[in-house]
Curated annotation (Swiss-Prot):
Domain of life: Eukaryota
Name of the gene: Fra a 1.04
Disulphide-bonded residues: none
GO biological process: abscisic acid-activated signaling pathway; defense response
Listed name of the protein: Major strawberry allergen Fra a 1.04
Function: Possesses ribonuclease activity in vitro.
SUPFAM superfamilies linked to this entry: Bet v1-like
InterPro entries from the UniProt entry: Bet_v_I/MLP, Bet_v_I_allergen, Plant_def-hormone_signal, START-like_dom_sf
UniProt keyword annotation of Zinc-finger present: no
One GO molecular-function entry: protein phosphatase inhibitor activity
Enzyme Commission number(s): 3.1.27.-
């Protein structure tokens, strides 16, 4: 098994506490509301929403995938960090065993946030992950993130 790691950074004008509440803690409710074409629904299969919780994410009509299952590996509300692993679903090909994601929000000097994301692709055998596959995923994540940011800017009293 090989592990391929990719890192991404986004910036936002939204401070980390507010962005973490919306983009991480309430994503299961907010994202289907503002981007139903991307995510139709999210449901807890097992657990209470904390570490160890198993969730099924059903994608919207605009997605090339049907659904995925992920497990929450860590939540640190004080340091605005979140990690989970994608463990089942059609986004995992016969070449990928699982994908682990780590996201951390840090304050930027202008009062906003820097969102640092690390993706670890755990492959089956000696398979290599193509850069264009990862780039496409990053572009979708960037678009989704921008939708959340726009929502928060348009609704300044939510997630305070």
């Amino acid at each position: 098994m090989g592990v391929f790691t990719y890192e991404t950074e986004f910036t936002s004008v939204i401070p980390p506490p507010r962005l973490f509440k919306a983009f991480i803690l309430d994503a299961d409710n907010l994202i289907p509301k503002i981007a139903p074409q991307a995510v139709k629904c999210a449901e807890i299969i097992e657990g209470d929403g904390g570490v160890g919780t198993i969730k099924k994410i059903t994608f919207g009509e605009g997605s090339q995938f049907g659904s995925v299952t992920h497990k929450i590996d860590g939540i640190d509300k004080d340091n605005f960090a979140y990690s989970y692993s994608l463990v089942e679903g059609d986004a995992l090909s016969d070449k990928i065993e699982k994908i682990s994601y780590e996201t951390k929000l840090v304050a930027s000097s202008d009062g906003g946030s820097v969102i640092k994301s690390t993706s670890n692709y755990h492959t089956k055998g000696d398979v290599e992950i193509k850069e264009e596959h990862v780039k496409a995923g990053k572009e979708k994540a960037s678009h989704l993130f921008k939708l959340v940011e726009d929502y928060l800017l348009a609704n300044p009293n939510e997630y305070c």
